[in-house]
Amino acid sequence: MTTSERRYHITTFGCQMNKADSERMAGILEDIGYQWSDDPNEADLVLYNTCTIRDNAEQKVYSYLGRQAKRKHEKPDLTLIVAGCVAQQEGEKLLRRVPELDLVMGPQHANRLQDLLQEVLAGNQVVATEPIHIVEDITKPRRESTVTAWVNVIYGCNERCTYCVVPNVRGVEQSRTPQAIRAEMVELGQQGYKEITLLGQNIDAYGRDLPGVTESGRHQHTLTDLLYYVNDVPGIERIRFATSHPRYFTERLIVACKELPKVCEHFHIPFQSGDNDLLKAMKRGYTHERYRQIIDKIREYMPDASISADAIVGFPGETEAQFENTLKLVEDIGFDQLNTAAYSPRPGTPAALWDNQLSEEVKSDRLQRLNHLVAIKAAERSQRYLGRIEEVLVEDVNPKDLTQVMGRTRGNRLTFFTGDINQLKGQLVEVKITDVRAFSLTGEPVKILSTSLS
């Protein structure tokens, strides 16, 4: 069977970085002749791009792998691949656990898939987890959307948060050059994409590893400089970035977001805990007072800006009073969106070895209480939209109501309204908001806007 007759399927777990990696690997496979299959059980190559941030995601991978391993006994020419963070963490141990695997590859090796696959097709079992310099990918990704796209700007993370496995599995920070990032965005603009999200595990660290400093001693290349550099890319209407770290978030960045017309008024800045002792134990490098100052400064420049974040409950040793400090921070700030999780011990992290682990019952109770408050505060934040006219970029049809389309406001609020997706996809539409929920809006279209800011 030639590659042009072979079908592939990729299942992606985890964060936006993983989704972007999967799109690049799909592009590589299609570049060498593979065809996409919606059904993994009909595919000749099955790739799981994995996440190890939470134990439940990791266990789900092993469940899926078990099914495909059985299938390989019936279909010996099936190529079975595990990529991503579980692959990096487990390495050769994965082959011992699932001997049917053909390739185990860490996230730094995503761009090398074609070369690694050649080794597999030559009859080898391959493990690629050694640290490498990430080279520019010349293969076009197979992107899920035709309207919005992710662009990686920095890989890896140099932080050492005591709960987080990311630095172990994604390696040290490696920034792409501004020229390479802009070139990719220019091509996306030419292809009709309207919105770009610049991605990094710690995007505020962008450029620290690139050569050059200014006369004042500042790094010559920063996220702020990058935003100014790419703001005028033709065809691109909106620019977002994620994920920010409070330790490196600057007022200069806020000013840039206010000044640059294409940069959306939405900030994703994880706080993880509202208690200073826990933040210190996590090695986050800031206090809750510093975090509040950042949010206050954003709202000073952009009062209507949307704020989203991440938070962990049940970190080892967390007392009820410390958890209530997190609740107080959420109450005081009022987030538009908050991604919450119960602490999950991860192999190779300091916190996993501590003897003051909390019970699953306590963690579950606190997670429910936090989520309840998050929904209340988000619903309160949504009220400000009622009756307003919002700019919405139409992305797709509403899968629950095919008479509606859906898109996002500049503040990243999911919005639904009646319309024909064939006419509106990729268009900026002014929508009058007639109904609000905690995390979504509904409205009526007012008019289609020009889709060229350049």
From Swiss-Prot:
Binding site residues for [4Fe-4S] cluster 1: 15, 51, 85
UniProt organism field: Gloeothece citriformis (strain PCC 7424)
Domain (Radical SAM core): residue spans on this chain: 143-380
Subunit architecture: Monomer.
Biological processes per GO annotation: tRNA methylthiolation
MTTase N-terminal domain location: 6-122
HAMAP family reported for this sequence: tRNA_metthiotr_MiaB
A single GO cellular-component term on record: cytoplasm
Cofactor annotation remark: Binds 2 [4Fe-4S] clusters. One cluster is coordinated with 3 cysteines and an exchangeable S-adenosyl-L-methionine.
Originating gene: miaB
Principal location: cytoplasm
Keyword annotations from UniProtKB, A to Z: 4Fe-4S, Cytoplasm, Iron, Iron-sulfur, Metal-binding, S-adenosyl-L-methionine, Transferase, tRNA processing
Compartments it resides in: Cytoplasm
Function: Catalyzes the methylthiolation of N6-(dimethylallyl)adenosine (i(6)A), leading to the formation of 2-methylthio-N6-(dimethylallyl)adenosine (ms(2)i(6)A) at position 37 in tRNAs that read codons beginning with uridine.
Family: Belongs to the methylthiotransferase family. MiaB subfamily.
Protein name, entry field: tRNA-2-methylthio-N(6)-dimethylallyladenosine synthase
A single MF term (Gene Ontology): metal ion binding
Domain TRAM: 383-447
